Curated annotation (Swiss-Prot):
Belongs to the UPF0178 family. InterPro entries: UPF0178. This is UPF0178 protein Shew_2726. Signal peptide: none annotated. It comes from the Bacteria.
Length: 150
């Protein structure tokens, strides 16, 4: 299993959790972004910088992700694409996207987009708090443990 991170939108606190997990579990974590960012020196952590543009980083993640890999993203269409390839998708709040729930989540996202386009103020998600960080860390640990038991 490799971990791919949609890094442009991933909160720093979540990246920090991923960096610690990479070292602890000796698992490859690759951040994909359209701008340079700091990463800790590690043989398990790397940054792939892609050109700017709509969905360029997403397309690179879809291209590289393989069945059994884990993709960290809040981008629901990206999650849907990698799930179709057999990868797992986890959002920064600890919610695991699966083939069983991704279609309904994608439908809700599309509905909210339609509402916003018609002028309805829907607001955005709250900042990531301690409970979301804990949920993410717990779900990540479960997935890594499951992978290592194979």
């Amino acid at each position: 299993m490799k971990i791919w991170v949609d890094a442009d939108a991933c909160p720093g606190v979540i990246k920090d959790i991923l960096f610690r997990a990479a070292e602890r579990a000796e698992i490859a974590v690759t951040l994909v972004a359209n701008h340079a960012m700091r990463i800790p020196p590690s043989r398990f952590i790397q940054l792939v910088t892609v050109s700017s543009g709509f969905d360029v980083a997403d397309n690179e993640i879809v291209r590289r992700a393989a069945p059994g890999d884990l993709v960290i993203t809040a981008d629901i269409p990206l999650a849907s694409e990698v799930i179709d390839k057999g990868a797992l998708a986890l959002n920064p709040r600890g919610e695991l996207y699966t083939e069983h729930n991704i279609k309904s989540i994608l439908n809700m996202r599309d509905f909210m987009d339609t509402m916003r386009a018609s002028g309805v103020q829907t607001g955005g998600p709250a900042a990531i708090g301690q409970s979301e960080k804990q949920a993410f860390g717990n779900q990540l640990d479960r997935l890594i443990t499951k992978y290592h038991k194979r």
